[in-house]
Structures are given as structure tokens and as C-alpha cells.
């Protein structure tokens, strides 16, 4: 059996990741840096403050708690503590483990409550009262869009957390916002051919969709992908965020003529809707002479743990998985496991990477002055952070990298081994014209606060 055990001597890991050597901490010293240009909260003392804005309550709280763990680990590594994590595997060698530009990294955090208004208020407070020079985090696209707009107004860079709506780097994109996570359009491109091969071209789909920006664009992307296969969309139904009982939404599916249910839900909402759909017996039914199937376009190991047996055989997509074998993934999984006793989620991974990418951009720019940091991020090619070669595209601030098609394992080894990576979709196959989703990045003008 595969397990994570924390001891005084570090992480003892049985299975595929055993025997990995810990990277040595870095203790390079750099002289003090004098800023000659000012933007909001450019640090003048010996520390620089990050603002971690994550959902610690609400339906996406499990993701938020893992994000905060990852951010705290990133701060340790940036400050030269611990084993260095992904710093040694990162293709850029600007970060030396001595803070950023000679300043020690400090942080403040806030609870977004999985609500856009609360996320915006929390971010504003961290900028205006706590002096945060960057805001990062979140697990809802509604939060991301709201905070990104605020940060554009304040002149503070926002490194998004887990946000999957096409709108984040589409119609609602901002010069001060950057997304590492993939999007709904990419999920549709990756997942469509796989479920087409698995379930055939003659299918009728029923969508239950979280009623906010992510759900809307996920539904749109999955409709496009499945209708391209020849599937018929029977009905699309919007559901409120954070409800516990989905019976009133699942019951009509039974008599709709649909033979596939597509759940455009995330976090606890996905856990509840999927488990209840299975309890209603949907997966045991034959409809139109076919076995009824359920598809969850976006899910994670954390959600799989919550869904339990219901996740078996379910197809979806993911941004990253801790069982990948590249050096960056191995290093991060080892560090996170040593610190917390569990493997990291995709939410933890994308947030850890975003913290490193911002810090690295400051080092490469030689300043915290926001317009120069933005320039350092735009068009940046990098590798070694768990997703293979990656581009931070300048036109929309979207990262392009390989994505994963995953499926719930029928016979998992343990509660950490619930997903099987079925296919890796190359970055070139999910790359699209930046103009298709509209939007305008806006100016990079510096602002003081």
C-alpha cells in the first residue's frame, strides 16, 4: 500500500516516489536593492509582503486550505528554508533562496468564503492595510474575475489561483492578472475525443451547471466539444452555488431521454451532485439502449476523496497530478508530503507555482515596480515546475502547457491514489487564438496606494 508518513528524518514514501533525494537549501546572499520607481506597496524595508486570498470556508474550502499550505511552503523555500522544493528544478535560476531581491518574504492571508464580494474585500484589505505587493489565490472564477478587476484598479499584480473560466483570460482579462491554471476550453478540447471514443457518437447529454462564470463557460465548452462528436444536448440547467441537496435537479434527468449527465460542478458541489446522482441509480440505468454515463469535466484528487466510490470510472480533466514523474513534480510532492503528510492537490500545485513565478519575475526584472514585473512575466517561457515546457502568453496572460485527461480508478491503492492519468494532451493541441474570447488587457500604468 502507498502511504505518506512524516518522521524526524523526513518523508518516508513507499511506491513510485521512494528514494528521492531532498534538494539542499540555498543560502546565497544578495545585496540590498534600491527602488527608483514606485508602484503600489513597493517594499522599502527588509521584507516584502504577499497576500494569500483563499477560500477557507464555503463549497471550495478544501481547495483553499490546500492552497494556503502550498503558499506557506513556497514562502519557506523562497526564504531558503526547507529543502528548496521546485527551486532547483525550475528552468529559471534567478531565485537563490534568499528571499526576493534581498528581502525576506512575509505574508498575510484572507478568507474569500468562496464568494466574489468577500474575495474582493479581503484582497482590498490586504493591499490597503497590510501592504501586500501581490495578491494570489482563490478557487472560484467569480472570485478571480472580481479580484483581478480590483487589482487592475489598484495597480497590484494578481497571480490567480484555481480559476477555470474562459473569461478569466478572455473577456475579463486584465494587464495586472496572470493565470497559470488551464481553462474550460482546454478541458473540452482534451476531454471530447476521449469520451467520444469511450461512449460513442450517438449520445444525448444533460448538463447541470454551476450558475456563475466558470459553470457557464464550462458548459459552453463541453457542449461545443460533444456536439462536434455528434452528441445531442437535451437540456442545460443552472444550479446555485453551495446547495447541498441536488435531488430536485437530478430527478428530471431520469425522464429526459438523456443517456449522459455532464456535471459542470466543482468542490463540494461536485461531491454532492455526483454522489447523489449515483445514489439515484443513474449509473445503473440503460437509456436508449446504452449504459447511462456521468462526466465531470473538471475534478481533482481532493474532490475524488470526497466522492468516494462514486468517482470510479468517471472521466474528467486536471491541470496537474502528483503522480507525474517529472523532476519538478517529484520535488514538490516530496516537499509537500514532508511538510504536511499528504500529497498536494492541483490547487496546491498551481498556487505554489504562481508564488514562485511572481518572485522569479521580480528577480529577473530587478525590481518590484509592477510595470516591469508585468513585462518579465509576459511571454515568459519556462520549465521544471510540473507541467513541462510552459509559456505565459503575453496577449492574454494565459499559461499554455500540457493538460491531463483523468479517470477515477476502479481499484485504487489508497485514498491518495484515486485518479488515473489516461492521456496527456500536448500544449500545442490546446493552444488557441487569443482573440477568440475577446477582452482587453488594459494599461500597465503604475499606481500608488
Regions picked out by a protein language model, each given a short descriptive name:
Residues 2-4, 10-32:
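N-terminal export signals
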Residues 26-53:
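C-terminal segment of N-terminal export signals and the immediately downstream linker at the start
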Residues 35-38, 62-69, 84-170, 180, ...:
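Beta-alpha junction/loop-to-helix N-cap segments that form part of ligand/metal-binding clefts
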Residues 47-64, 68, 205-208:
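Short beta-strand segments enriched in small/hydrophobic residues
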Residues 63-91, 187-190, 213-229, 357:
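Short, solvent-exposed amphipathic alpha-helices that sit
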Residues 117, 129-237, 283-285, 290-315:
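Extracytoplasmic ligand/sensor domains, especially the bilobed periplasmic-binding protein
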Residues 267-270, 322-381:
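Extracellular/periplasmic ligand-binding modules, especially the Venus flytrap/periplasmic-binding
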Residues 381-449:
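Solvent-exposed, acidic/polar segments of extracytosolic/periplasmic ligand-binding ectodomains
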Amino acid at each position: 500500500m502507498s502511504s505518506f508518513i512524516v518522521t524526524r528524518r523526513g518523508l518516508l514514501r513507499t511506491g513510485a516516489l521512494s528514494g528521492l533525494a531532498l534538494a539542499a537549501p540555498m543560502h546565497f546572499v544578495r545585496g540590498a536593492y534600491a527602488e527608483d520607481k514606485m508602484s503600489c506597496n513597493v517594499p522599502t524595508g527588509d521584507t516584502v509582503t504577499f497576500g494569500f486570498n483563499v477560500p477557507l470556508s464555503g463549497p471550495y474550502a478544501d481547495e483553499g486550505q490546500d492552497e494556503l499550505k502550498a503558499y506557506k511552503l513556497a514562502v519557506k523555500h523562497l526564504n531558503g528554508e526547507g529543502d528548496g522544493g521546485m527551486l532547483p528544478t525550475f528552468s529559471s535560476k534567478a531565485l537563490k533562496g534568499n528571499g526576493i531581491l534581498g528581502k525576506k518574504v512575509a505574508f498575510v492571508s484572507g478568507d474569500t468564503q468562496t464568494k466574489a464580494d468577500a474575495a474582493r474585500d479581503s484582497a482590498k484589505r490586504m493591499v490597503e492595510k497590510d501592504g501586500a505587493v501581490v495578491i494570489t489565490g482563490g478557487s472560484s472564477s467569480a472570485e478571480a474575475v472580481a479580484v483581478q478587476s480590483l487589482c487592475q484598479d489598484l495597480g497590484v499584480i494578481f497571480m490567480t489561483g484555481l480559476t477555470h473560466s474562459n473569461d478569466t483570460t478572455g473577456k475579463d482579462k486584465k494587464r495586472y492578472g496572470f493565470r497559470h491554471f488551464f481553462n474550460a476550453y482546454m478541458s473540452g478540447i482534451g476531454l471530447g475525443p476521449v469520451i467520444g471514443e469511450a461512449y460513442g457518437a450517438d449520445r444525448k447529454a444533460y448538463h447541470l451547471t454551476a450558475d456563475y462564470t466558470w459553470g457557464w463557460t464550462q458548459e459552453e465548452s463541453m457542449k461545443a466539444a460533444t456536439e462536434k462528436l455528434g452528441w445531442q444536448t437535451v437540456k442545460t440547467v443552472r444550479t446555485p452555488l453551495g446547495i447541498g441537496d441536488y435531488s430536485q435537479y437530478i430527478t428530471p434527468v431520469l425522464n429526459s431521454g438523456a443517456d449522459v449527465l455532464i456535471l459542470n460542478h466543482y468542490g463540494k458541489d461536485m461531491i454532492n451532485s455526483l454522489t447523489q446522482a449515483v445514489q439515484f441509480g443513474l449509473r445503473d440505468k440503460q437509456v436508449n439502449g446504452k449504459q447511462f454515463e456521468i462526466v465531470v469535466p473538471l475534478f481533482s484528487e481532493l474532490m475524488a476523496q470526497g466522492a468516494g466510490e462514486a468517482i470510479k470510472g468517471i472521466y474528467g480533466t486536471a491541470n496537474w497530478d502528483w503522480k507525474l514523474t517529472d523532476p519538478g513534480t517529484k520535488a514538490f510532492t516530496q516537499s509537500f508530503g514532508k511538510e504536511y503528510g499528504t500529497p498536494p492537490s492541483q490547487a496546491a500545485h498551481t498556487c505554489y507555482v504562481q508564488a514562485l513565478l511572481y518572485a522569479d519575475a521580480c528577480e529577473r526584472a530587478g525590481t518590484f515596480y509592477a510595470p516591469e514585473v508585468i513585462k518579465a512575466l509576459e511571454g515568459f517561457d519556462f520549465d521544471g515546475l510540473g507541467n513541462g515546457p510552459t509559456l505565459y502568453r503575453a496577449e492574454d496572460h494565459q499559461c499554455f502547457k500540457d493538460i491531463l485527461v483523468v479517470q477515477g480508478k476502479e481499484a485504487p491503492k489508497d485514498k491518495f491514489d484515486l485518479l488515473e492519468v489516461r492521456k496527456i494532451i500536448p500544449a500545442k493541441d490546446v493552444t488557441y487564438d487569443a482573440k477568440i474570447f475577446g477582452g482587453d488587457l488594459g494599461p500597465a500604468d503604475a499606481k500608488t496606494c
